[in-house]
Amino acid sequence: MPRRSIPVKLASAQLCEHRVIRIARGFGLSMEIEFKFCIPPERLQAVEAAMRRGAVRRTRLQAHYVDTPGGALAAAGMVLRLRLEGPRWVQTVKAAGDGPLQRWEHNVDLGPQAGGDAPAADPQRHAGTPVGDRLLAVLRDADGPLRESYATDIERLTREMRSGGATVELALDIGRIRAHGADGALREAQVCELELELLRGDVRGLVALAQAWSQRHGLWFSTVSKAERGERLLHGVVAVPAVKAAPVPPSFAGLDGHALQQAAIAHCLAQILPNASEVAAGSSDDEQVHQLRIGLRRLRTALRDLDALAPGLDPAWEAPLVEVFRMLGVRRDRALVLAQAQAALETASAPPVDMGDDANTSDDPGAAVRAPAFQAVLVALIGHGAAPPGPATTPGLDATDARRHLRDRLRRLHRQVLRDGERFDTLDADAQHRVRKRLKRLRYLAEFAAPLFRPKAAARYLARLRPAQDSLGRFNDEAVALALYRARVGQDPRAWFAVGWLQARHAAAGADAQRVLRRLRKKAMPFWRGRKARD
């Protein structure tokens, strides 16, 4: 089935479902924190047995999701659902909140229905609530009446547990999602998930419990909701576009050290988590792998350069992030770099070379992402983003000192890039590679810091960095391709042509990189100078 983009905003609106803002039935406002994990089929029996070691409650949940014929609600990133919970029907509306970590939700308990039939969906039931008024506004200009889009039939096993001063509800969901496509064909997908929701208490207790269950049973974190899976079934979508990094929001300006550190990490996770979810579930899409690697590099920059803003970052997080980044890079080198090199060599009338296509193909990106060590870091980072500041004895930097710290970091990286750019041709291969990595760090840190200084000047600065990063990227790709062909010389002597040809291209790419790097001294004007925070 061909790739199709989902004609909805659910993919972006539900990037990080671990944090949710919910309006309860009494219209009260509360913060809900939850983790959702996918369960490998071979581990389901063990998970269910572990659930049953305490008092459990079994509930059958039959839900009907409705929308207009043109998908007005899905396009607005909203969900309207009728769900039978035991003997009672509940109507729920959900919508994206102010950011990728938030969601509005309002529930109306309709009670048992005569005859057991599902009640009709009525958007007016949510009138007078923020999300309800938004629902009515979307439907006001809709293209037709509400009708069922897809349905779920879930057996839920729930259990409450105590962990580190927290009360957590565990919900094991097993069942199916069903949707009829435009051609009338019935499409189904299995559901096998474990959700952990903080009912009350310290979020660190939830994180510890999520760590324990995910590590013990080989679970992996997923951002893909049942609603999004239903939309995919409805539209026959089997692959979704990779998620790129969103622009850093102006709200970063004025944040103290702890809040800025949390915001930057959350911004990185908003790119990492949806791509990691797809790859862990079996996607081999090269762009998803590529964007996941970009997100990991941005995250490592945040962890390294924002560490001094506030306590709480664990140095042990670095190693699993580096390992997954490296393993995914092996795939990229063969999938992208080799394809580009082969196309260029073919144009140059090079003889075909047996590149041993079976080499490294055993490296499964999904297995790398599902690795317990990597999943443990994701859970810890999600928990860090939801945790309140630490004790008063270890406060983070205030907004002024946080801004000063970023300015010092930017100044240092900027000077290092300029210094090494002047002598790029004299550096060895490892040092040249460090220049490329340092330039990326400078770019990502500049993106995080832009709202704190002069955003327009920062945009100009970043635009000046881009040609240098592109040039160093080409230089690196030439080096990778050269190494791949050099490694094949023993198996196929025809690779010598490629080695010589690529060696010449690599030298030319290095000269171009030095020229572009030297231009930065005059072109890339630091935006962090001066006291003004804005243009």
Feature names for model-found ranges:
Residues 3-4, 19-25:
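Basic polycationic patches enriched in arginine
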Residues 8, 20-22, 30:
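Residue-level detector of intrinsically disordered terminal segments
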Residues 26-535:
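Function-determining surface determinants
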